[in-house]
Amino acid sequence: MNKIKWIFLTLAISFALVSCGGVSNKTIIRHQKMEEGVDSPTSIEELKDAIKKYQERVADVQLAQSQIGIWYKILGTRYLDNKMYGEALKAFQEALTYYPDNQNLYYYVGVCAGYMSHAALDYNASGTNEVKYNYLKLAEEAYLRAIAIEDRYVRALYGLGVLYVFELDEPEKAIPYLEKAISIDTKNLDTMFVLARAYYSSYEFDKSIAMYDKIIETTKSDDTKKTAEENKKIVLDASY
């Protein structure tokens, strides 16, 4: 515990020195040498000892940075649980600076951006929905990045499908992602409903009807079955 505290204290001192005008890199290096007890090694043993100490310093800093990234992710999920989507979005963005290849973080960015689009009002009365649209495009980009990292990531596939169908009004784009999600999680009723809607909105009525039939066959809930039957009737009426 004391070692961890010392790591963060050392980092804080280094950042403070860098932020002060007129402080050179030589000053920072001199402080580091004092901390490690290394000055100007010349012999083989002194050089080996200096290398070992600085390797340990690098490992300590990497450990500290890794932990900071994890804490930002946890902070983001806490904000998300409390429906503080703007703060959650900021925390996940910070976490991505430490873990830029983490598909879960991109997924959470997509979720938060989607929620923030609902709160994006035209406060300047400009007559445009630019802020809302920007959040929606951020959500799209985040989901796509998550899928690029893990192409079988069902939650991201589903989230992107919902975005295309209900927010961006691009149901044709949703279909391949939702179909892939269904091929992985074959009994996910939520995905089935969104895919059926995507087919309907794309005028693929036969596929929409077939998907509602699949929901009716799969579900054990009377309410879910009733909803699927009602939606199926709407599609049948539209197909004639």
Where are these regions (language model features)?
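N-terminal leader/linker segments that initiate helical-solenoid repeat arrays
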Residues: 19-78, 82
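Structural signature of tandem alpha-helical TPR/SEL1-like repeats
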Residues: 48-55, 82-91, 118-144, 168-180, ...
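Terminal, low-structured helical/coil segments at or just beyond the last alpha-helical repeat
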Residues: 60, 201-240
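Canonical positions in the second alpha-helix
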Residues: 61, 95, 145-146, 180-181, ...
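Helix-start (N-cap) detector for alpha-helical repeat units in TPR-like alpha-solenoids
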Residues: 69, 103-104, 154-155, 189-190, ...
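Canonical tetratricopeptide repeat
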Residues: 74, 108, 159, 194, ...
